[in-house]
Amino acid sequence: MYDAVNAGKMDVILGYSTDGRIGSYDLVMLKDDKRFFPPYDAAPVVSDKLLKETPEIKDVLNRLDGKISTKKMQELNYQADNDLIEPAVVAERFLKENNYFEGE
């Protein structure tokens, strides 16, 4: 879809606001002022088993709350999808740049 709109074969497409290709194709996201589309908010999800075995993981993961903007997520996704950097490497770089491991 992104290639098609970039090539002028389409004028409008539906995509995720965090897709890294939005910036790479210089596309414009329209504001959904009618709230037609449900919000897509990423959230950590863990099993009850993991939470019981490692209760401290809750606080560790909650430190990410509100730390990744849509723009930043686009950049991170672009690195993984376009630059073909392993997602684990992209994530580790982000965490280090934001002092996530500080004090550990």
What is each residue range found by the language model?
Residues 1-13:
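Short helices/loops that flank or line small-molecule/ion binding pockets
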Residues 41-54:
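A bilobed periplasmic-binding-protein/Venus flytrap-type ligand-binding module shared by bacterial periplasmic
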Residues 15, 24, 39-41:
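Active-site lining segments that contact anionic ligands and/or coordinate catalytic metals
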Residues 7-10, 21-35:
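Ligand-binding "clamshell"
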Residues 16-18, 48:
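Short secondary-structure boundary segments
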Residues 55-103:
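Ligand-binding clefts/hinges and TM-proximal coupling segments of bilobed small-molecule sensing domains
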Residues 36-37, 63:
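A detector of mature, structured extracytoplasmic domains
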Residues 10-12, 40-42, 57:
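A short pocket-lining beta-strand/turn micro-motif at the edge of beta-sheets
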